Amino acid sequence: WEQYYRRRNHLARNHAPLEAKRFAGMAGEMAAVLWCGLVLLLGFGIPSAWLLWAAWRYVGDTDWAAFAHMGFYTLRLALTVAAIGTALAFVLQAWQRATARGKGLIRLAGLGYGVSGTVLAIGVLMITTAFDHKINAISKALGFGMVGLIWSGTIAALVYAFLCRFAAVSLWAVESGFAHIPPSLDQSAFLLGCSEKQTAWRLWLPLLRNSLVTAALLLFLESMKELSAAMLLRPFNVQTLSTYIYEYISAERFEMAALPALLMVVLGLPLVALLLKTMED
């Protein structure tokens, strides 16, 4: 039966090749513009207009001190994850390039992208909590007393979870950049007396500039909008943009979520434009 249906539904045998439909004349061009504009209007224009209206109407009810702290915390978290994740991706891919080893380790590091944020956050919470308990037990045994939650109660747990969650994004971006560097350049550098570290610093790093920028931008965007891991691992009395929006949406106070949603859009759109420009280059 499988072979029968496969033969029956084979596109190459039963259907003509797909051809792009071309619009002729001014009417066709206007139809294409209107159709694309309608998609943009429904998907971005109308929602953005409503967010602007709601943010303007309820701007007087905003706690600006808490809002600024939340925005700064989200920005610091995303920048930290982007910097550390991009650096680790470059180090791992450079090590794999120089030694032809570690391919399995890189694939293992990228498995977190296929795990949901909630499941990953629970695993990270178990690890960080056990680490904190062990540190407190050792400190108490040495007579220094309890040191508190130095791992699970800080931004470090979020950074760790986000790096595990989005490592694949940066690894793939850097790996794609390395694929465009011919091995003959590496051999030339080695013949000229450059060590592996010098080759990585003086050859690979400049050539991978666009790939590293792409990896950093992707990590920043993913970290800024991640919700489930942030809900479980954020320190007490600390909000990110995504958790702040979620709490107001859950309470059906949609207007109060408009301003942080706009801030997320304002932060994300220029980065997306820069990302597209970098990928084109």
PLM region spans:
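Membrane-interfacial helix termini and adjacent extracytoplasmic/periplasmic loops
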Residues: 14-22, 64-65, 100-105, 121-163, ...
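Membrane-cytosol interface at the C-terminal ends of specific transmembrane alpha-helices
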Residues: 151-190, 216
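Transmembrane alpha-helices
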Residues: 34-42, 111, 164, 171-174, ...
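Transmembrane alpha-helix signature in integral membrane proteins
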Residues: 1, 5, 65-96, 104, ...
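Cytoplasmic-entry segments and transmembrane alpha-helices of multi-pass inner-membrane transporters
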Residues: 28-35, 92-128, 186
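Interhelical loop and adjacent transmembrane-helix boundary motif
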Residues: 1, 23-29, 51-65, 224, ...
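C-terminal transmembrane helix and the adjacent membrane-cytosol boundary/short C-terminal tail
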Residues: 1-23, 92-101, 175-186, 190, ...
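Periplasmic/extracellular loop-to-transmembrane helix junction in inner-membrane transport proteins
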Residues: 19-30, 49-83, 98-101, 145-150, ...
